[in-house]
Amino acid sequence: MSRKFSMTPIAHIHSDFAEKFGVPRQSGLVEELEADIVFEPAYQNPDALRGLEDFSHIWLIWVFDRAIRDTWSPTVRPPRLGGNTRMGVFATRSPFRPNPIALSCVKLAGIRQTAEGPVLRVRGADLVNGTPILDIKPYIPYADNHPDALGGFAAVPAGETLSVSIPPALLAQVPAERQEALRGVLAQDPRPHYQKDPERVYGFSFAGFEVRFTVDGDQLTVRDIRPAE
């Protein structure tokens, strides 16, 4: 018998990304990125986190809340393959799934107590600001690490990172503690894989700023940084 399950978010993430564009394609690619996990009132009991401080990494189980559709397709076109080849949805990490659930492994940088309950500081997250978190589990090295694992069409990294050039006057607008994270995000090439026009200006929101850039070959040049409206 088929059963349905209703789940309630235990927390939401506070990250530097207001939109999907610019978010790293996988967790852990830009460890300089920091984000906070803030718990909902019903889950703010510090006892629920007892012992978590002894783990260096955690799993986040979350919802693709910006990609929910009424229907789903058994095949998708992974951007990694240029958007031209179809693969089975269960052989990909596409957000367009029967159940839009995601899994990210992030570094646990700290746990702090606040008047509103405990807050987790994490690094390397690939989530848009406000994304609902369904569950948190510790990463257990002996069980979760598989050196002999095969990676299918994603067996190797997506490619070389880009060389990033940001004029000092533009970079100075970004808080010092966000600058390396911004460089890391840009080096991962935020563009869709099928867009390679060197004249096109791309843009995304990061940490309260609008960032505009172009890419020519393996060189990314930031053209403008200004406060987001």
Locate the predicted segments by residue.
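Mixed-charge, low-complexity intrinsically disordered regions
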Residues: 1-101, 113-121, 125-229
